[in-house]
Amino acid sequence: MTEELLKAESCFVLRAEDRADMFAQVYKKLLEQRLVAAGFLDQVVDREEDFPTGLASCNLAPGLPNLAFPHTEGCFVKQQRVVPIKLLAPVSFKSMVDPSRELPVGFCFMLLDQKADGQAELLARTMTFLSQAEPAALSRIFAQTDPAGLYSALREEGF
């Protein structure tokens, strides 16, 4: 990833009651950083309900947390960014493969892009990183418990 897509101030470690609470906490921080527009929260919640982004991590390596890649329409985004979110306790996301299945997700990569097809590009780049990283490196990244450590671990692995 390029330096512009990953910023220390946009790496979060948080505890959320549920998916809606996680979205609300992250939205507040992104709004303060002027990365998203008003309306982003409702849109990301609605889009996640209609087009789930949860993904079981079993194909990457055993023992890794399930992942999610929430995003929304570009008109609600002010600046391109990949926002890593470590969840201290898993929250439930619907599976993108089987939306009838709920997954306990422990880590999210929120994708912010103003372009209509930008999220697909960011998703592809993020998935390439995840599929090429060593399982031990991913374990180290996903084990971080503070934002600075999360940012450092991602940068050290070339994200």
Describe each region flagged by the PLM.
Residues 1-159:
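Cytosolic covalent-transfer regions centered on His/Cys nucleophiles
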